[in-house]
């Protein structure tokens, strides 16, 4: 193989090949490289200052991108120099990250594959252990995150995701303006959210937060009131309506066990129809519900009350929204619906947080979209024990999706 072709394989600015060896049996190409400048300057690994006062040197063997079917290894001279600021430090090589055994472009290629395929498939392609692939991917994502501009933090979203065994819940804190998560932590206690403020949100940045979208989980509210006393707590619309849907379902179960014979058979199998909004039903489903409501007034009232509650978030002025909700709550007194009376007491306790939406129009849908992205990432990766790695993966996926042109 001509030396000119071997030198062309490298393409590392400032470095050249001075020796090489090809092993046909293993399809391995080893290149010995060093700086090409007549009087090379070495940069301190700590402060980056250039210098020529060498302390010692050694050879480092690192893996580079393959050349066709050939595996390429680089043997590079690594120097230790005496820095006037940092003392004796290892030189900084621009295409190597610290003490890495892989070039930066090799790590970037592995990380790019990890965006489209699970770790097991990427590991098989590159002939690497799965844990090594995760480590390389995480290192690239960390460098990407460190180079991003810091987005303003004015609207926070706080929610939890149910995981199941082990760590049952994962608390997710999101920036609702950029639509991406900014912190994740195990469990859903007040201490969990306290740790977010201690680790990731210093006091000087807290004063810019105007509103927080959160569910009606009291430990979260306690932590937010303590750390962000000036911010408005806006209770998530979808969580409120989920409680209303649960009240409809509880009413359906009560009616099923209260009725007998044909009346019970009519209620059977109608759960998903009752949980769907009237606007999302086709003509046949609407006719089925009309027949059910004609024979069961309690289910008709429960369904109507749930749909009426959704109109609350269409009001712009707090006074009108408060009047609407007060009228809705008064209507519950004359209905024999225990589940909705329980819902009314819940809404009364959280009235101010629900009505704060009139002052801060937080995007409720982004909270659910972020949770959906995290669940999709968890399914594809079959779970993540490293929460920092999960956060970086979702941030990268969200940023990539935001840059793609609309179809």
Predicted regions and their residues:
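Mobile-element integrase/transposase regions
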Residues: 148-181, 186-199
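The DNA-recognition helices of helix-turn-helix-type DNA-binding domains
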Residues: 129, 140-144, 216, 251, ...
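A structural signal for short, well-ordered beta-strand segments and their strand-loop junctions
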Residues: 122, 157, 213, 233-235
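Short, surface-exposed amphipathic charged segments that create phosphate/polyanion-binding patches used
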Residues: 245-256
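Acidic/histidine-rich catalytic cores and adjacent linkers
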Residues: 37, 41, 46, 52-53, ...
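Short, positively charged, Gly/Tyr-enriched micro-motifs
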Residues: 48-167, 207, 222, 354-355
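Short, conserved DNA-binding cores of transcription-related domains
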Residues: 1-88
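Active-site beta-loop-alpha junctions of metal-dependent nucleic acid enzymes
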Residues: 99-101, 135, 182-205, 211
């Amino acid at each position: 193989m001509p030396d000119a072709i071997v030198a062309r394989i490298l393409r590392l600015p400032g470095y050249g090949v001075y020796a090489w060896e090809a092993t046909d049996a293993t399809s391995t190409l080893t290149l010995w490289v060093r700086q090409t400048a007549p009087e090379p300057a070495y940069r301190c690994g700590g402060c980056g200052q250039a210098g020529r006062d060498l302390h010692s040197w050694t050879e480092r063997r690192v893996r580079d991108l393959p050349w066709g079917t050939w595996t390429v290894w680089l043997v590079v001279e690594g120097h230790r120099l005496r820095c006037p600021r940092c003392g004796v430090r290892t030189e900084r090589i621009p295409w190597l990250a610290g003490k890495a055994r892989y070039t930066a472009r090799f790590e970037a290629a592995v990380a790019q594959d990890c965006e489209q395929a699970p770790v097991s498939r990427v590991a098989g392609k590159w002939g690497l252990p799965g844990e090594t692939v995760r480590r390389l991917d995480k290192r690239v994502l960390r460098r990407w995150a460190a180079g991003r501009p810091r987005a303003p933090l004015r609207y926070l979203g706080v929610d939890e995701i149910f995981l199941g065994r082990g760590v049952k819940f994962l608390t997710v804190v999101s920036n609702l303006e950029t639509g991406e998560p900014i912190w994740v932590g195990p469990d859903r206690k007040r201490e969990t959210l306290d740790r977010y403020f201690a680790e990731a949100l210093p006091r000087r940045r807290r004063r810019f937060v105007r509103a927080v979208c959160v569910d009606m989980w009291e430990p979260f509210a306690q932590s937010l009131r303590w750390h962000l006393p000036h911010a408005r707590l806006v209770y998530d619309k979808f969580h409120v309506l989920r409680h209303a849907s649960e009240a409809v379902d509880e009413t359906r179960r009560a009616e099923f066990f209260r009725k007998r014979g044909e009346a019970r058979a009519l209620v059977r199998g109608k759960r998903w129809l009752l949980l769907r909004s009237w606007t999302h039903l086709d003509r046949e489903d609407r006719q089925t519900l009309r027949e059910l409501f004609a024979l069961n007034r309690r289910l008709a009232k429960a369904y109507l009350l749930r749909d009426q509650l959704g109109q609350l978030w269409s009001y712009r002025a707090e006074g009108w929204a408060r009047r609407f909700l007060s009228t809705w709550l008064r209507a519950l007194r004359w209905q024999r619906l225990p589940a909705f009376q329980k819902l009314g007491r819940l809404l009364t306790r959280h009235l101010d947080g629900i009505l704060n939406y009139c002052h801060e129009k937080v995007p409720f849908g982004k909270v659910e979209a972020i949770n959906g992205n995290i669940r999709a990432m968890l399914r594809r990766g079959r779970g993540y024990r490293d929460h920092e790695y999960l956060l970086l993966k979702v941030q990268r996926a969200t940023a990539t999706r935001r840059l793609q042109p609309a179809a």
